[in-house]
Amino acid sequence: MTKFSQNIDYLRNKVFVPGVVLSTLYSPGLSAKTCIIKYLDGEVRKILCPTGLKPGNSVLTGIEIPIALGNHLLLKNLPLGTDIHNVELYPGCGGKLARAGGTFANVIAKEGSYVTLRLPSGEVRFISKYCWATIGRICEKNNGKKALYKAGQNRWIGKRPHVRGVVKNPVDHPHGGGEGRSPIGRSHPVTPWGRIALGQRTRKSKRYSDLLILSRRK
């Protein structure tokens, strides 16, 4: 995906420097659109475009600023029920969560040093109240539902043709080999590296962040 490097500003660290949306752009390597922001000091950056943000609108990053579309704030300053995207996992690391087209997280509770968020996957977890997030939902709400009119549309976003393991040679895949249309010869499908596929959970056990997850993803 280095071919489609976008240089998108996920950190949004221009604190208290107003910016104006110049235009919205289609980005071939992303499922969401981006927009060009020109800040008051003359710097130009590209950010993810939330639904409803149009050329001429202003955006701002700050601690106690208006709750407006496209503004970037600390989680502790967001009211309950706010839809957000580009959410940090740890303070100062840049947005990591809810960045795909049509996705958003929701602020559902505040307690102590943590804010409780419902993520796009359905997972409910604690995140530090000192993490930053951007207000609004990512545009392209029909992401994943549009019918493709040519194979090249998948190639634009980095998806290449997928070959089934059962039609490969046994040296290339555990499902391979046999005469004609033969079964895989196993009780359960596996990955090319021999691990159980289709339903097996791959998250490592005993991770430190397990204590922060209230409800696992659906």
UniProtKB/Swiss-Prot annotation:
Subcellular location(s) per record: Plastid, Chloroplast
Transmembrane intervals: none
A UniProt-annotated Pfam family: Ribosomal_L2
Positions of the UniProt region annotated as Disordered: 165-192
GO MF annotation: an example: RNA binding
Disulphide bonds in the chain: none
Keywords from the named record: Chloroplast, Plastid, Ribonucleoprotein, Ribosomal protein
Primary location group: plastid
Top-level lineage group: Eukaryota
One GO BP: mitochondrial translation
Coiled-coil parts of chain: none
GO cellular-component term (any): chloroplast
InterPro entries on file: NA-bd_OB-fold, Rib_uL2_dom2, Ribosomal_uL2, Ribosomal_uL2_bac/org-type, Ribosomal_uL2_C, Ribosomal_uL2_CS, Ribosomal_uL2_dom3, Ribosomal_uL2_RNA-bd_dom
Classification via PANTHER family: LARGE RIBOSOMAL SUBUNIT PROTEIN UL2M, RIBOSOMAL PROTEIN L2
Quaternary structure and interacting proteins, as annotated: Part of the 50S ribosomal subunit.
Family according to the record: Belongs to the universal ribosomal protein uL2 family.
NCBIfam families (alphabetical): rplB_bact (TIGR01171)
Protein name per UniProt: Large ribosomal subunit protein uL2c
